[in-house]
Amino acid sequence: MMTDFKKMDILSLIKDSFFYGLSKLIPGLFGLISVIFFFRWVGAEEYGQYSIIFSFTNLIAAFSFGWLNQSILRYGSSFSSENKIVYPLIIGSVYGVSFIISILAIGSYFYFPTKFPLTTTILLAGSISVFNQIKTRFQSNESPKNVVLITSLQSFLMFAFAFFTTRWMGANAVSLLLGLAFGYLIPSIFCIKRIHLGQIWTDKNKLMVKKFFNYGAPLSLWFGIQLSLNFSDRFFIEQFYGPQLMGSFAGFSEFIIRVFSIIIFPVTLAIHPKVMNQWNRNQNTHETFRHILNGGLLQIVIFSGVLVLALVFKHHIFNAILSLVPGIDMEMETLLIPLLIGGFLWQFGLIVHKPLEVAEKTKKMVLCILGALAINIIGNYFFLPKYGLIVTAYTMIASGTFYILSTVMFSPSFWGRIHSK
C-alpha cells in the first residue's frame, strides 16, 4: 500500500513535469512548426540536405563545448564572482572554436557528410555553442525564467530568420542553415554582459580549464555519441536511398521527436534535479531510487496512452501529419509505431541511467552509448539496403533497448544497495 509520503512524491513529480512542460511548450511548438514549414518551403530533397548538415554541425558543437557546459553545471556555484568563472570559460571557448573550425574545414574538404558551405556551418556551430553556454549558465544560476525566455526567443528568431533567408537567398538548405545561425546568435549577443577583463591566460585559469575538461570530457563525449545516432540514420539513408527519401525520413522522424519533447521530455527534466539534489544531500540510494522509479513509471503511463491512441488511429494520425508536411513518402506510415517505441525507449533510458550519472560513472555511460551506436551502424550498414527504412526504425529500438539493459547491468552496486534496504 502506497504511503501518503510516496503519493506526495508522485504528485510533486507530476506537478513539476507539468510546469516543465509549460516551459517547453513555446520552444516545442515553434520547433514543431519549424519542421512543418521548413519542409514546405524547401521540399524533401533540400530538407534532407539541411537535416544532415545541421545534425553534423550540432554534433561538432556538442563535442567542442559540451565539456564546458557540464562543468558550468557542476562547478558554477563554487565561484565567488562571475568574473572568476568567465576567464576559464573564455580559454575553453577558444579551444572549442578552434576545434569547430578544424573539424568543419576537414569535413568540407572531403565533402563529409556531404558538400556544405564552410563559413555558414562555422557560424552555425559557433552560434549553437555560445547559445547553449549562456543557457547553461542561466540553469546553473537557477534562473528558469531566463531559460524559458531565451529558448522561446531563440525558437521564434530561428523561424523568423529562416523565413527571411529562404526568401532572400532562395528555398534551399543553405538559406535554412543561415537562418538558424542568426536565430541562435542574436539572443546570445543580447545576453553577453560587459565585464572587466584582467589577465586571462594565467596558470590558475589554465589549471581550471584542465579541471573542467577532465570532468566534462566524458559527458561531452556521451552527448556527442548520442547525437551521432540521429546523424548515422540520416547518413546511411542518404548513402543508400538518396536525399529525397532521407528528407522524408528526417521530416517525419523530427515531427515525432518534437511531439515527444512536449509530452515525455518534461518528466526527464523534472526528475533530474530531484535525483541530483537527493543524492547530493545524503547519497541515500533508496530515496534516489524512489525518484527514478516514479519518473520511469510516469513516463510509461504517458507513453502507454500515446501508444494505444497511435495503434487505434494510426492511419488517421499519418494522414494528419501528411496534411501538415506534404511530400513525405508514403512508406513513412509503416515507421510510425516503431519510431514512437524507439523514441520512448531513449527517453526512458535517460532516467534509467541516473544511477550511473549520480555516481559519476561517466566512462561506463560512454561504453553503453558506444555499444548502442555500434548496433545502429551495423544495423543500418548491413540491413538497410536489403530491407528498407523499417530497419532504421528497428535499430533505434534495438539500440535503445541495449542502452537501457547495459546501464542497468553496469549499476549492480546501486541496485544491490536498493534491495538491501
PLM regions and their residue ranges:
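Signature of the first transmembrane helix
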Residues: 9-68, 159, 217-244, 254, ...
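Membrane-water interface segments that mark the loop-to-transmembrane alpha-helix transition
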Residues: 15-27, 53, 58-116, 281-307
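Helix-loop junctions and terminal segments of transmembrane helices
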Residues: 64-80, 252, 256-283, 355-358
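Interfacial segments at transmembrane-helix termini and the short loops linking adjacent helices
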Residues: 44, 108-121, 312-344, 390
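Transmembrane helix-bundle signature of multi-pass secondary active exporters and lipid flippases
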Residues: 54-62, 226, 249-269, 273, ...
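Alpha-helical transmembrane segments of multi-pass membrane transporters/permeases
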Residues: 16-27, 84, 88, 122-128, ...
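Hydrophobic transmembrane helix module of multi-pass membrane transport proteins
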Residues: 92-221, 345-351, 370-371
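N-terminal membrane topogenesis motif
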Residues: 1-30, 205-222, 407-421
